């Protein structure tokens, strides 16, 4: 048989042309140090800041420190199986988390993995945890109210959709309760809620999740949890993961409420990571960029322009103070970033005034423009009245004789404090808030004994529900008060029927 050299050479040539090498070229390095959620690696010459890196055992890390000799890496998850000398590879990607509708009703960790035992989350959408905030021209001013269902907040420090309102106070003053009640009040309000629990006990998070489930709020809520037992990198990442999930909905034109509970623990986790990465410590041993840590997070909350869908992210960050010191480093940082703060006082809480909102130290810088007309009318002088009452109350401790006008102010003040109290997990619709505050500010409660105010309010709301639902409907639909004569007549009718005269 004759050998055809041309045929063979053509065949070989074809084989060479069709050959596809079955390998990929990736830059690798070697782990030189491991411990406390931190690794150092040598050899990753072209790695990017924030890039995702893959360890030999399948764990992932994120490049944080880019130095001339090595790279400082925070490890996402368990680091006990990683050893010095292990290989580490670049992925060329930055960290992303799963996003979308399928996360609603689920409890996930900061990497988007389910921790509620309800199976896998099926979504093919992801978003980067670090993303630029909307620019100046991409934003709209805050104009729509976000009703918390709490009289003290909706009347004194109103919050608008797209606002950042800090909730600040000592531990055990009711910060989480305010957030949970606000989430409960978003039912049927076309609002998606994200609750980010940072550095809390797992039993506490479980309790919050059960509360949300019990009241049907888990149907529109995502819970992101990085518990106290988890490594610092996950506590540091949790808020960014939460806001990435929120951005997906915002850019679809939806409205989102996100709660960060709390950013003090995130700052402590970041301080721990920074010290382990040998970054220079500053005030209170925090690194120099701790302000940027929170500003780049909170600036991502906004009400975006109509061209981008007109959606919004409203942020309620928490800061825990020590002995009521709101001039501490992290507290003043976050106060300067946010659009106002709600200060919860230890003394008020212990005196049974709950929610323990200190009206004098609390402010909402942009929420007033989002408050509905009816609430503006009834609550306009409430803050000043409350402040003057506190002043007079302190003055009366000296036992001075009081004139009739001062005594009347004190009586009104005591009733105001009682009306603004509210039981937990019982948010009140805004139309009911308006009616009781109208009755208060127009003197209808001046003859009601202070001890009977709570019972008075319960019966008052029941009466309006049964006898005058049209008044509540008018306030709900028009966002304004009905004719004063109509309201006065209805309240007088209630007083004539009741035993409070």
Swiss-Prot record:
ATP binds at residues 169-176. It is found in: Cell membrane. Induction: Induced by a decrease in external pH from 7.5 to 5.7. One of its GO terms (cellular component) is plasma membrane. The keyword Cytoplasm does not apply. The keyword Transmembrane does not apply. It catalyses: ATP + H2O + 4 H(+)(in) = ADP + phosphate + 5 H(+)(out). One of its GO terms (molecular function) is ADP binding. The record marks 362 as: Required for activity. It is a peripheral membrane protein. Its main location: membrane. Its EC number is 7.1.2.2. Keywords: ATP synthesis, ATP-binding, Cell membrane, CF(1), Hydrogen ion transport, Ion transport, Membrane, Nucleotide-binding, Translocase, Transport. Pfam families: ATP-synt_ab (PF00006), ATP-synt_ab_C (PF00306), ATP-synt_ab_N (PF02874). GO terms for biological process: proton motive force-driven ATP synthesis. F-type ATPases have 2 components, CF(1) - the catalytic core - and CF(0) - the membrane proton channel. CF(1) has five subunits: alpha(3), beta(3), gamma(1), delta(1), epsilon(1). CF(0) has three main subunits: a(1), b(2) and c(9-12). The alpha and beta chains form an alternating ring which encloses part of the gamma chain. CF(1) is attached to CF(0) by a central stalk formed by the gamma and epsilon chains, while a peripheral stalk is formed by the delta and b chains. Produces ATP from ADP in the presence of a proton gradient across the membrane. The alpha chain is a regulatory subunit. Belongs to the ATPase alpha/beta chains family. This is ATP synthase subunit alpha. It comes from Streptococcus pneumoniae (strain ATCC BAA-255 / R6). The lineage of its organism: Bacteria, Bacillati, Bacillota, Bacilli, Lactobacillales.
């Amino acid at each position: 048989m004759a050998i055809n050299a041309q045929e063979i050479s053509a065949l070989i040539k074809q084989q060479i042309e069709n050959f596809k090498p079955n390998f990929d070229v990736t830059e690798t390095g070697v782990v030189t140090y491991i411990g406390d959620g931190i690794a150092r690696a040598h050899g990753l010459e072209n790695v990017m800041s924030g890039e995702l890196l893959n360890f030999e055992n399948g764990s992932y890390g994120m490049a944080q420190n880019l130095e001339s000799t090595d790279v400082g890496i925070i490890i996402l998850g368990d680091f006990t199986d990683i050893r010095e000398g292990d290989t580490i590879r670049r992925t060329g990607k930055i960290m992303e988390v799963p996003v979308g509708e399928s996360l609603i009703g689920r409890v996930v960790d900061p990497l988007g993995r389910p921790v509620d035992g309800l199976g896998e989350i099926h979504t093919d959408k992801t978003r980067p945890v670090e993303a630029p905030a909307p620019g100046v021209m991409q934003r709209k001013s805050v104009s729509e109210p976000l009703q918390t269902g709490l009289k003290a907040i909706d009347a004194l420090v109103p919050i608008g959709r797209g606002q950042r309102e800090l909730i600040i106070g000592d531990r055990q003053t009711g910060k989480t309760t305010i957030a949970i009640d606000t989430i409960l009040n978003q039912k049927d309000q076309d609002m998606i809620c994200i609750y980010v629990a940072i550095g809390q006990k797992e039993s506490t998070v479980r309790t919050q999740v059960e509360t949300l489930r019990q009241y049907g709020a888990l149907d529109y809520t995502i819970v992101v949890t990085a518990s106290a037992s988890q490594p610092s990198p996950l506590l540091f990442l949790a808020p960014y993961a939460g806001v990435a999930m929120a951005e997906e909905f915002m850019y679809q034109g939806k409205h989102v409420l996100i709660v960060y509970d709390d950013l003090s623990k995130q700052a402590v986790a970041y301080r721990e990571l920074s010290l382990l990465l040998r970054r220079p410590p500053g005030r209170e041993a925090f690194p120099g960029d701790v302000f940027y840590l929170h500003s780049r997070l909170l600036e991502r909350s906004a009400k975006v322009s109509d061209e981008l869908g007109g959606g919004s992210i409203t942020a309620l960050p928490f800061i825990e103070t020590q002995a009521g010191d709101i001039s501490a480093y992290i507290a003043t940082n976050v106060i300067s970033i946010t659009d106002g703060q709600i200060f919860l006082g230890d003394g008020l809480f212990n005196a049974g005034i709950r929610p323990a909102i200190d009206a004098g130290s609390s402010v909402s810088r942009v929420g007033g423009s989002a408050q509905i007309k009816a609430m503006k009318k009834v609550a306009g002088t409430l803050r000043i009245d409350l402040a003057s009452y506190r002043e007079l109350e302190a003055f009366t401790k000296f036992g001075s004789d009081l004139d009739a006008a001062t005594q009347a102010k004190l009586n009104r003040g005591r009733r105001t404090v009682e009306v603004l109290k509210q039981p937990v997990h019982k948010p009140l619709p805004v139309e009911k808030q308006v009616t009781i505050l109208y009755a208060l500010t127009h003197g209808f409660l001046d003859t009601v004994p202070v001890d009977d105010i709570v019972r008075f309010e319960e019966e008052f709301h029941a009466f309006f529900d049964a006898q005058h639902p049209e008044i509540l409907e008018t306030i709900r639909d028009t966002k304004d008060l009905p004719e004063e004569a109509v309201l006065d007549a209805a309240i007088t009718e209630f007083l004539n029927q009741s035993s409070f005269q």
